[in-house]
């Protein structure tokens, strides 16, 4: 068999080497205390003692970005989808009270295109910088026959640490707690199968009246907001009883994940800062209004359950608008009641 047999099978080893060289500078941006070793080892290493946590509990999360990737491919814009991937992982573990420490990514593609994959990893690195996590490992798999030449998939894995006494597991959320929300940056990274159906006949260049001058494609690919730096000070001061990351399933599925079965969340819809894109989706997709809250974040990406006496301190620490959108009540039917 000839020496280029692997290339004849559709796998370009040299392109793989080029990707590694291209991404080194991006990975270097994510360096933080605790990282041991560099790229190229069989496993990434992290020295947990550097965190200063006395009773460490490791908390991990994994996620992808769903079919938002198909829009990145359609619009040939690959430099922010990596940030989405990081956000989906680190926002989940911050909801458990963890400080994210390190991240690993996995990219699978039909054809290794170094310039495009560099953009993807650059986005991952940017997400890591925003989260304060180190990108300590990853895998790029060229899989001809599994994926089309222009296609790729992306997944991420985040590990964080929490003081055992500061774990947020829902057990402290109580009747009377106030629900505070932080704004989302857009759709984030869920519901895109529906989004793509609604806008299937659009080029992405359109400026819809609802979108306040922005092109549709820019709004649809707006990166998922990362909440780590906003939430960590609140966790360290033990100011929040519960945290909900509003992702797939919207308010209805995600808010109840932060409290026990005997409680419910009462949401004042008038206090939710609904973003223009959600109004457009509801209109052009002819989606029932109540269903929107079952699918999308509607403008709130992270929610806290806070004792009334801690509300002002939380607002003081958060250097941004904080939306007081509801409260925790005794359950009498549904787990989330939107009024």
Curated annotation (Swiss-Prot):
EC number: 6.3.3.1
Keywords of the record: ATP-binding, Cytoplasm, Ligase, Nucleotide-binding, Purine biosynthesis
GO molecular function: ATP binding; phosphoribosylamine-glycine ligase activity; phosphoribosylformylglycinamidine cyclo-ligase activity
Subcellular location: Cytoplasm
GO biological process, one term: 'de novo' IMP biosynthetic process
Pathway: Purine metabolism; IMP biosynthesis via de novo pathway; 5-amino-1-(5-phospho-D-ribosyl)imidazole from N(2)-formyl-N(1)-(5-phospho-D-ribosyl)glycinamide: step 2/2
Catalysed reaction equations from the record: 2-formamido-N(1)-(5-O-phospho-beta-D-ribosyl)acetamidine + ATP = 5-amino-1-(5-phospho-beta-D-ribosyl)imidazole + ADP + phosphate + H(+)
Gene Ontology cellular-component annotations: cytosol
Broad class of where this protein is predominantly found: cytoplasm
Top-level division of the source organism's lineage: Bacteria
Annotated family: Belongs to the AIR synthase family.
Cross-referenced NCBIfam families: purM
Entry protein name: Phosphoribosylformylglycinamidine cyclo-ligase
Encoding gene, per UniProt annotation: purM
């Amino acid at each position: 068999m000839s020496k280029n047999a692997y290339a004849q099978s559709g796998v370009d080893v040299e392109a793989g080497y080029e990707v590694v060289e291209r991404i080194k500078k991006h990975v270097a941006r994510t360096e933080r205390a605790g990282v041991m070793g560099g790229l190229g080892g069989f496993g990434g290493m992290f020295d947990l003692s550097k965190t200063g946590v006395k009773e460490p509990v490791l908390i991990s999360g994994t996620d992808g970005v769903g079919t938002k990737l198909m829009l990145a491919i359609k619009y040939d814009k690959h430099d922010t989808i990596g940030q989405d991937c990081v956000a989906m992982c680190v926002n989940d573990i911050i909801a458990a009270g963890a400080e994210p420490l390190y991240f690993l990514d996995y990219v699978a593609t039909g054809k290794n295109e170094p310039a495009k994959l560099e953009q993807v990893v650059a986005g991952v690195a940017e997400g890591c910088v925003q989260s304060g996590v180190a990108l300590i490992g990853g895998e790029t798999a060229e899989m001809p026959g599994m994926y089309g030449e222009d296609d790729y998939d992306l997944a991420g894995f985040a590990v964080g640490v929490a003081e055992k006494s500061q774990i947020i597991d829902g057990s402290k959320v109580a009747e009377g707690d106030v629900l505070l929300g932080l704004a989302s940056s857009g759709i984030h990274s869920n519901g895109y199968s529906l989004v793509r159906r609604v806008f299937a006949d659009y080029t992405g260049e359109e400026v819809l009246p609802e979108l306040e001058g922005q092109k549709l494609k820019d709004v649809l690919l707006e990166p998922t907001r990362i909440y780590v730096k906003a939430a960590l000070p609140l966790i360290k001061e033990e100011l929040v009883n519960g945290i909900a990351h509003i992702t797939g399933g919207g308010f209805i599925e995600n808010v109840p994940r932060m409290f026990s079965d005997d409680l419910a969340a009462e949401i004042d819809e008038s206090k939710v800062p609904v973003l223009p894109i959600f109004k457009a989706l509801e209109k052009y997709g002819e989606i029932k209004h109540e269903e929107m809250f079952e699918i999308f974040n509607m403008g709130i990406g992270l929610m806290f359950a806070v004792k009334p006496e801690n509300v002002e301190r939380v607002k003081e620490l958060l250097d941004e608008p904080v939306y007081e959108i509801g409260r925790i009540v005794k359950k009498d039917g549904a787990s989330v009641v939107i009024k």
